[in-house]
A protein has these predicted regions:
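Hydrophobic alpha-helical segments and helix pairs
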Residues: 89-132
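Membrane-interface helix-loop-helix modules in multi-pass inner-membrane proteins
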Residues: 47-100, 112-113, 198-216
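Hydrophobic transmembrane alpha-helical segments in integral membrane proteins
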Residues: 1-17, 135-143, 264
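Transmembrane alpha-helix/helix-exit interface in multi-pass inner-membrane proteins
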Residues: 138-163
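Interfacial loop-to-transmembrane junctions
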Residues: 224, 228-249
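Juxtamembrane boundary at the C-terminal end of a transmembrane helix
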Residues: 252-266
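Membrane-interfacial loop-to-transmembrane alpha-helix junctions, especially the N-terminal start
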Residues: 30-42, 91-98, 182, 211-214, ...
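Membrane-interface interhelical connector segments
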Residues: 156-178
Length: 266
């Protein structure tokens, strides 16, 4: 199966799981179900298959263009979902994670941002450089999941304030647990991004200032959120809002890198 076909199947799995859950929610008879979790597993398996096929064709980690970066980001987010979901009610975190994975992959599939590897596309491996890039994108995956948890927090807080407790509310994690999850995910992403930046400086003799500026900018944003939370300068609600806003800015950096960095150097 061609790598893009694997990606299309993965994207359909995420859409199927999300659509099923939305249908059940709309019927007013929501109950925790393994269907969405199974769809997430299917999507992840085909995501992994795509990355393996593309990596084999390139003889390198598949992070050579914005198309591959978006898929790797989606994969990282889903992987982290499986790692932390058991602590924060798998079914509901997956409901909010699957549409974001679907959006990332749909944008990648329909946008003219891919250059499929040809028979001469294989390049000399650069393990440390690939490690630097992969760590940085996994950090973005942690920020994406923090954004998802932030949305869940804001939905639950609104329902509590308006006293309109709908079916989904009773299956959301306690709001205090969501606040802790957001903080820990941001902290995890911050540490990974720090490692990514440090390894980037270590493995590249020349400095690409466009990447440095964007990367350090994201690092400062999330570092500021963590520091403000540590000093009790912001409420948990504000941290949730900032996690959503910060990830929106982070997504813009991916496009910024695509336009500002030298072609093919992602």
């Amino acid at each position: 199966m061609e790598d893009r076909a694997l990606l299309a199947v993965s994207t359909f799995c995420f859409l199927l799981g999300f659509a099923y859950t939305m249908f059940v929610l709309g019927s007013g008879r929501y109950r925790p179900s393994r269907f969405n979790f199974a769809a997430m597993i299917g999507g992840f398996v085909f995501q992994t298959g795509f990355l393996v096929e593309r990596g084999h064709a390139l003889n390198a980690c598949p992070l050579t263009n914005l198309f591959e970066v978006l898929i790797f980001l989606s994969w990282s987010m889903v992987l982290l979902y499986f790692l932390v979901g058991t602590a924060y009610r798998i079914s509901l975190l997956g409901v909010f994670t699957s549409p974001l994975a679907f959006i990332f992959q749909t944008v990648a599939l329909i946008s003219p941002i891919d250059s499929p590897p040809g028979p001469r596309a294989r390049v000399a491996p650069q393990p440390w450089l690939e490690t630097h890039a992969a760590i940085s994108i996994v950090a973005y995956g942690a920020f994406a999941l923090a954004c998802v948890a932030g949305v869940m927090y804001l939905i639950q807080e609104r329902q509590l304030k308006t006293h309109r407790l709908r079916g989904m509310f009773f299956y959301l994690p306690p709001i205090a647990d969501l606040a802790v999850a957001i903080n820990r995910l941001i902290f995890t992403g911050f540490i990974l991004l720090t490692l990514g930046l440090l390894t980037g400086f270590a493995v590249r003799p020349e400095v690409e200032w466009s990447k440095v500026i964007w990367g350090v900018g994201v690092w400062l944003i999330y570092g500021g959120i963590l520091q403000a939370d540590k000093w009790r300068r912001v409420t948990p609600r504000r941290v949730a809002v900032l996690s959503v806003a910060a990830f929106s800015i982070t997504l813009a950096t991916l496009w910024g890198l695509n336009f500002l960095a030298p072609k093919g150097s992602l």
